[in-house]
Amino acid sequence: QVAQTLGLDRDHAINLGLPGLMSADLVELVKTGKMSEMNTLSGCQYDYPEIVEYLKEADIISIQMGSNDAFVPTVVAIGNATNWKSEDLASIVLSGNLRSKDPETRAAFQASMKKLKLTKSETDAVWNLVTSGMNKICTDAYPVSTANIRSVVETVRALNPDAQILLIGATNPVPLLPSWSNYFNKLNKFQKQLAEVYDIDYVAVPYAQ
């Protein structure tokens, strides 16, 4: 929808989205074209020297980041809590099927939990994560994400002073969790304000208020 509004098509676009990339990783990539070391949480390490030249030559650059700073640590925490029985739960989160707050969404989450066949201690660990652990994850992620978003915007603007920069709202995959809703609401508010400061365009998307 964003591309259609701007009159763009995929034939003239390069998708530089990389799976598992967290905001600190993107800071390195836009500055040097590579990550200095593996991200131990996501397991990714990218060496992509072309990215800097692509950014220098682009007419329009869209940036969407911040979601993985909360999402990746949460997936790892769920894995640790369930002794890595959590593939079904991770899959349903990744699918986006938990983006609604309706009863069907809650039922899907509960059904996914049942499939895990967790022990009592594992179940307790998961619910502790949901009720308090995720709040810490999101609280820790916010200052990191905001600092890195600012750094990426500044770096991209320095590389290409003339490009139109679109700062795309971060999407919340699980809005039924209060800690996540708070994180993404704050993150997108920050991005809107940042866009005004740097005279770039903020683009809201569904589940990115």
Feature annotation, model-predicted:
Residues I63, L167-I168:
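Structural beta-sheet core signal
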Residues L6-L8, N148-L167, F190-V203:
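A structural motif corresponding to the C-terminal end of an alpha-helix
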Residues I14-G20, D201-Q209:
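Acidic carboxylate-rich catalytic motifs and surrounding loops in phosphoryl-/glycosyl-chemistry enzymes
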Residues V2-P143, A147:
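Conserved SGNH/GDSL esterase-like catalytic core that processes O-acyl groups on lipids
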